[in-house]
Swiss-Prot record:
GO function term, MF aspect, one: polyubiquitin modification-dependent protein binding
Organism per entry: Pongo abelii
Family membership noted in the UniProt record: Belongs to the BABAM2 family.
Function summary: Component of the BRCA1-A complex, a complex that specifically recognizes 'Lys-63'-linked ubiquitinated histones H2A and H2AX at DNA lesions sites, leading to target the BRCA1-BARD1 heterodimer to sites of DNA damage at double-strand breaks (DSBs). The BRCA1-A complex also possesses deubiquitinase activity that specifically removes 'Lys-63'-linked ubiquitin on histones H2A and H2AX.
Protein's recorded name: BRISC and BRCA1-A complex member 2
Any GO BP annotation: positive regulation of DNA repair
GO cellular component: BRCA1-A complex; BRISC complex; cytoplasm; nucleus
Location of this chain's protein in the cell: Cytoplasm; Nucleus
The protein's assembly and partners: Component of the ARISC complex, at least composed of UIMC1/RAP80, ABRAXAS1, BRCC3/BRCC36, BABAM2 and BABAM1/NBA1. Component of the BRCA1-A complex, at least composed of BRCA1, BARD1, UIMC1/RAP80, ABRAXAS1, BRCC3/BRCC36, BABAM2 and BABAM1/NBA1. In the BRCA1-A complex, interacts directly with ABRAXAS1, BRCC3/BRCC36 and BABAM1/NBA1. Binds polyubiquitin. Component of the BRISC complex, at least composed of ABRAXAS2, BRCC3/BRCC36, BABAM2 and BABAM1/NBA1. Identified in a complex with SHMT2 and the other subunits of the BRISC complex.
Principal localisation: cytoplasm
Length: 383
């Protein structure tokens, strides 16, 4: 159910509270997922004109789980705060004295429900942390992370028994990694979706037993960051080492991700330098180039009255990864009607060269390769 459809069924006096939650509500670390409501119902009599829904189920992301809490208002007394039922978490009994926004409920503030929900989630986090006492090993993992503010202040935990019959205990740690994404080129962060949310990297580590013999890490990137770093398959984090600890493993993942970000930033500046050098060396031979991301360049050149194009594709992780040169005849066609072309990656190249050196080496390579390309075009292409 879309937020607009849900809100149209809510009692008008309660609608501002719920609207603030579903339209602007960001609770917890996973800011890429908005809160949503389902199971709208009414406690009013059948004679009450609609819309009159005043109770619903709130879905919230937390530590890789989805919390489903029932929120119950009374449409007849909309100035009163709601009741909460915490679904499967029957053991969760929040401390009313710590719920300041519930005790001083202000119905004139549209965000009062959202503020109460945030307070409840904070208490729920403490409730989950307390459950780790059932495992000294998992408690150690938690306490060592807690001693590091960059991790301890950005962590969610979900713990509990996997199997009530065997007593197996499991836990999941979700951490917001302290990685700086602010210098990623803006062109890489475009066109993902209209409201991408916060740029964030979340590391989920699941302990399937109390002795940490089965540990499964997974990295989650917000959509813009995943796109900027080359897609979901571009970053592979190491397996959790046998006998390892989170306090050692998490910095390794941070370091890996930071290096990946630096590669992308460096690649952008190096590509810009590369294209600037080619503009200088080839002048009017430049047909077009990508002036935003500096990922493509096309040259129109001539060798002994033979005109040809060179398309240069610069990869995301340039200069570590070598550009592809595609030579294309302007006269000859393939059987499918395409201009005859050959792609080359086997040419003199070093990632240590600056843009000027790369342009000079490319010009020299063009002179040696074009004769055989021309011969191949005449032999295999059609005029």
């Amino acid at each position: 159910m879309s937020p607009e459809v849900a809100l149209n069924r809510i009692s008008p006096m309660l609608s501002p509270f719920i609207s603030s939650v579903v339209r602007n509500g960001k609770v917890g670390l996973d800011a890429t997922n908005c809160l949503r409501i389902t199971d709208l119902k009414s406690g009013c009599t059948s004679l009450t004109p609609g819309p009159n829904c005043d109770r619903f189920k709130l879905h919230m992301p937390y530590a890789g789980e989805t919390l489903k809490w029932d929120i119950i208002f009374n449409a007849q007394y909309p100035e009163l705060p709601p009741d909460f039922i915490f679904g499967e978490d029957a053991e969760f009994l929040p401390d009313p004295s710590a719920l300041q926004n519930l005790a001083s409920w202000n119905p004139s503030n549209p965000e009062c429900l959202l503020l109460v929900v945030k307070e409840l989630v904070q208490q729920y986090h403490q409730f989950q942390c307390s459950r780790l006492r059932e495992s000294s090993r998992l408690m150690f993992e938690y306490q060592t992370l807690l001693e590091e503010p960059q991790y301890g202040e950005n962590m969610e935990i979900y713990a509990g028994k996997k199997n009530n019959w065997t007593g197996e205990f499991s836990a999941r740690f979700l951490l917001k990694l302290p990685v700086d994404f602010s210098n990623i080129p803006t062109y890489l962060l475009k066109d993902v979706n209209e409201d991408p949310g916060e740029d964030v990297a979340l590391l989920s580590v699941s302990f399937e037993d109390t002795e940490a013999t089965q540990v499964y890490p997974k990295l989650y990137l917000s959509p813009r960051i995943e796109h900027a770093l080359g897609g979901s398959s571009a970053l592979h984090i190491p397996a959790f080492p046998g006998g390892g600890c989170l306090i050692d493993y998490v910095p390794q993942v941070c370091h890996l991700l930071t290096n990946k970000v630096q590669y992308v930033i460096q690649g952008y500046h190096k590509r810009r330098e590369y294209i600037a050098a080619f503009l200088s060396h080839f002048g009017t031979g430049v047909v077009e180039y990508d002036a935003e991301g500096f990922t493509k360049l096309t040259l129109l050149l001539m060798w002994k009255d033979f005109c040809f194009l060179v398309h240069i594709d610069l990869p995301l992780f340039f200069p570590r990864d070598q550009p592809t040169l595609t030579f294309q005849s302007v006269y000859h066609f393939t059987n499918s009607g395409q201009l005859y072309s050959q792609a080359q990656k086997n040419y003199p190249y070093s990632p240590r060269w600056d843009g000027n050196e790369m342009a000079k080496r490319a010009k020299a390579y063009f002179k040696t390769f074009v004769p055989q390309f021309q011969e191949a075009a005449f032999a295999n292409g059609k005029l």
